Amino acid sequence: MVSAIVLYVLLAAAAHSAFAAEHCNAQMKTGPYKIKNLDITPPKETLQKDVEITIVETDYNENVIIGYKGYYQAYAYNGGSLDPNTRVEETMKTLNVGKEDLLMWSIRQQCEVGEELIDRWGSDSDDCFRDNEGRGQWVKGKELVKRQNNNHFAHHTCNKSWRCGISTSKMYSRLECQDDTDECQVYILDAEGNPINVTVDTVLHRDGVSMILKQKSTFTTRQIKAACLLIKDDKNNPESVTREHCLIDNDIYDLSKNTWNCKFNRCIKRKVEHRVKKRPPTWRHNVRAKYTEGDTATKGDLMHIQEELMYENDLLKMNIELMHAHINKLNNMLHDLIVSVAKVDERLIGNLMNNSVSSTFLSDDTFLLMPCTNPPAHTSNCYNNSIYKEGRWVANTDSSQCIDFSNYKELAIDDDVEFWIPTIGNTTYHDSWKDASGWSFIAQQKSNLITTMENTKFGGVGTSLSDITSMAEGELAAKLTSFMFGHVVNFVIILIVILFLYCMIRNRNRQY
């Protein structure tokens, strides 16, 4: 009787426990299943942070002494309107300035020219041919004055004016290094970005000026360690690098060709560790660009920006692929952990899938699933005379063990992923070659010459009608004198001919 009562109590307690907690139907098992692991794909990009880089640098611009000298000469003769020798001979000449003169001009900040000759006529007109070197007159700089007059009848007239200028200006330089010998040389660039032969020893005469380098160009060499991003087509072949961008002094340089990469006043080369294959057709480094660095709008800087954009894009892809691979690796590790724990907690897999199922393992990684009932959401470890204990719902008669966990705190047990995201955008911008102060000085002197040659000033003394007739002062009087003299001579000759004919006719009438 007593044993029957004990058995009844145990059955009642078991039934109450099953009713209060979840219930799984072992008759509705499905499967078998295995947890699917994710593929871990390594990124195509490889980041090397300690790449040895050789940098050769020179000054961005160089001081160039620029000077010019020339003269305008008008040598005229007035023999009257009937004299075919009446004319004005104009001469415009630019003189080459020698090395010694350029250096002296630079020291004195003055240039040397000849004497201004204004309305020299008669024997004084020979002064036009006495000094064609331009010596004796030191000025800060001057522009010639175009003078013409031919108002001295039966005499020669000379007008001669000088121009000169001196400036120590900047011209942009470019450094070039030979791949075979690693020898480097500095070139001075013209307005189009082409190298010109300006040295400290030889004067270059071009564009109407003479120029010489003030000091010999020098360059420095240094070694640094930089972060380089290697892009690979074939992840399994370490020799398949097709692109390599390095972050150097906040600028991005393409070192894909393992040769000297020269931009403006800097050349960069890295230690050869691998052979770079041919680049994809979408962006060819070894094909000449449709633009030239240093042109108007600084297209060389646009090339720099393009390199930065490509670098940033490749870096972003690398970081995303690294993150994807890292997440997949963690997921696979988590899968192994889930399988291990699910052998103890049969509801784990169902909870992770947000589904009320229970798992029963057939082997180390294969299991069956069965549907289960689940209590509603709650904020306590107790529910309907049940308590959640050691991963399961069990019967509970001690309410003191119930805990309200509505105000819980989060505990961090892992760290965030560290990404390599350098700050870029501090690109070193360069001016256009033609914006160098030296070429601006040359362009300005050309403009001044064009302006002064468009305005002619006439010397001499004479008529007040020069502004109306566009003649030199005194030239109108000379022309009128020549005109009257010529007509008087013609009148006398015609009168003599008429008298001669009259006399002949009269004598002939007398004979008859």
Curated annotation (Swiss-Prot):
GO CC annotation terms, alphabetical: host cell plasma membrane; membrane; viral envelope; virion membrane
Q: Which UniProt keywords apply?
A: Disulfide bond, Fusion of virus membrane with host endosomal membrane, Fusion of virus membrane with host membrane, Glycoprotein, Host cell membrane, Host membrane, Lipoprotein, Membrane, Palmitate, Phosphoprotein, Signal, Transmembrane, Transmembrane helix, Viral envelope protein, Viral penetration into host cytoplasm, Virion, Virus entry into host cell
- What topology in the membrane does the UniProt record assign? Single-pass membrane protein
TM helices/strands, residue ranges: 482-504
Modified how: Palmitoylated.
Which cysteines are cross-linked by disulfides? Answer: C111-C164, C128-C158, C177-C184, C228-C246, C262-C267, C382-C402
Query: Localized where?
Result: Virion membrane; Host cell membrane
The record, for Gene3D superfamilies, names: 2.40.50.710, 6.10.250.2130, 6.10.250.3010, 6.20.460.10
Lipidation feature positions (S-palmitoyl cysteine): C503
Cite the record's note on assembly. Answer: Homotrimer; disulfide-linked.
**Protein name, UniProt field:** Major envelope glycoprotein
Q: Which organism is it from?
A: Autographa californica nuclear polyhedrosis virus (AcMNPV)
Which gene does this sequence derive from?
Answer: GP64
